């Protein structure tokens, strides 16, 4: 699928950012400049302004739009990048006025994702998101699309180019959706196979450019792509990690988040983000040197909630402490539980503390529980005995077993997602929300309570 018949895109860009009811936020503008640079653009000028509300025609007022046109001409800009979500009509009107291609924030992020995707799945996800975004912006021809298709007597010369474009996009969306469904099924099959012998899993999440991939590479030795740019990583990398004490976990590096992440991308990357949604523990990596780190934490948590990962336990990992006068350390809550670790992945400072904190979260604060394992779950049963987590076993007449175990919440969560395993009861303390969906009412048995 080729591009629109629009003014040709180049690298020289004018950036646009308005303050809606407030002055322009310089930090937001700087982040948008980073986005533009990450996309390969060369910012040559910036147009800012302030309005109470967006203008229906240009988003900005007509006077500011004319100023934008003059700035673009004077600086020989070839593209206009707007740090807001534009409606299709606003985008078209600005293109007609300026004679330049216009991309809003969503379009720019989609373009970056298109450049960064390396795996077959990642490329399909990005293309699907782009087509859904573009489909709302069709006005006149993608004249270089594939030839018109249609059966005899079905679609003749009366079909307009716009109708053809919409139909071809619709067909491509269906094809991509089916391919991604197959990949998702394959990924789920692999995940279920790993779950047969449950191993705790970690997912690195965080705001883009917080240093997740640097940490992942420093910690695991994995060949994860590292660059000082936004969205350097799109495709998840999964590796085994051995923690202090010999505990084996699976770690996954995931795509970074950002404010106003286009909904099309969140939807398209659902299967990839499953690595975070189904993790035992999240390592929420934060740029400790960023003045807006608390805002970034909130924005990442909002995306985690959108994908259904808000109840997964977290350790906050404050990275890049080499830029601050801060020593590596572990922060704890009132119960003594490790809640945050301060490190520098690039300088390899505090990585031992992080590994210790993760191992601690996976092994400390155990609670008693009763679980039922079906006859097919022999590997799970063996692993629980090897971990010395079994306190008693009560064989069932159907070949299943009820085990009284003592495990931390994060490992109970792993068991709750394991085929052939059912959480029956966690007495004495409230059941975590993450386990409640799996639990059954307490079962009376001859074995009695524990």
Placement of each model-derived feature along the sequence:
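N-terminal accessory targeting/assembly segments
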Residues: 1-105, 109-110, 423-424, 429-450
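C-terminal-of-GTPase-core extension/linker across diverse P-loop GTPases
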Residues: 1-19, 28, 33, 132, ...
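Short, charged, surface-exposed secondary-structure boundary motifs
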Residues: 111-116, 235, 351-353, 433-435
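Flexible beta-alpha connector loops of hexameric P-loop NTPases
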Residues: 19-24, 53-58, 116-121, 161, ...
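Short alpha-helix plus adjacent loop in nuclease-associated cores
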Residues: 107-128
């Amino acid at each position: 699928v080729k591009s629109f018949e629009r003014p040709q895109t180049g690298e020289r860009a004018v950036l646009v950012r308005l303050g809606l009811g407030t002055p322009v936020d310089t930090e937001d503008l700087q982040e948008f400049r980073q986005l533009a640079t990450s996309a390969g653009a060369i910012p040559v000028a910036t147009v800012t302004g302030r309005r109470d509300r967006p203008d229906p025609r240009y988003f900005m007022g007509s006077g500011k739009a004319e100023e934008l046109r003059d700035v673009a001409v004077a600086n020989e800009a070839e593209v206009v990048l707007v740090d807001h979500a534009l409606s299709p009509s606003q985008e078209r009107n600005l293109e007609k006025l300026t004679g330049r291609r216009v991309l809003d924030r969503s379009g720019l992020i989609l373009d970056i994702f298109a450049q960064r995707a390396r795996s077959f799945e990642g490329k399909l996800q990005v293309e699907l998101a782009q087509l859904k975004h573009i489909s709302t912006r069709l006005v006149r021809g993608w004249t270089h699309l594939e030839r018109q298709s249609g059966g005899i007597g079905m679609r003749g010369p009366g079909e307009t180019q716009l109708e053809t474009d919409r139909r071809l996009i619709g067909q491509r969306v269906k094809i991509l959706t089916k391919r991604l469904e197959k990949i998702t099924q394959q990924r789920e099959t692999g995940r279920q196979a790993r779950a047969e012998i449950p191993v705790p899993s970690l997912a690195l999440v965080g705001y883009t450019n917080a240093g997740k991939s640097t940490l992942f590479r420093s910690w695991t030795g994995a060949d994860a792509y590292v660059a000082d740019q936004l969205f350097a990583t799109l495709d998840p990398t999964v590796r085994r990690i051995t923690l202090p004490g010999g505990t084996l976990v699976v770690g996954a590096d995931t795509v970074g988040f950002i404010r106003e992440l286009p909904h099309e991308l969140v939807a398209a990357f659902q299967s990839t983000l499953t690595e975070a949604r189904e993790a035992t523990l999240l390592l929420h990596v934060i740029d400790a040197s960023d003045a807006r780190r608390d805002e970034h934490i909130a924005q990442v948590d909002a995306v985690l909630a959108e994908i259904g990962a808000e109840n997964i336990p977290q350790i906050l990992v404050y990275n890049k402490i080499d830029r601050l006068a801060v020593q590596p350390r572990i922060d704890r809550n009132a119960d003594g539980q490790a809640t945050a670790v301060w490190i520098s992945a690039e300088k390899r400072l505090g990585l031992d503390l992080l590994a210790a904190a993760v191992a601690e979260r996976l092994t400390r604060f155990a609670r008693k529980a009763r679980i039922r394992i079906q006859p097919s779950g022999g590997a799970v049963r063996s692993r629980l005995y090897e971990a010395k987590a079994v306190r008693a076993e009560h064989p069932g007449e159907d070949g299943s077993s009820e085990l009284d175990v003592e495990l931390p919440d994060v490992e109970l969560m792993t068991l709750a997602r394991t085929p052939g395993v059912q959480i029956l009861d966690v007495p004495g303390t409230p059941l975590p929300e993450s386990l409640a969906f799996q639990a059954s009412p307490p079962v009376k048995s001859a074995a009695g309570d524990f």
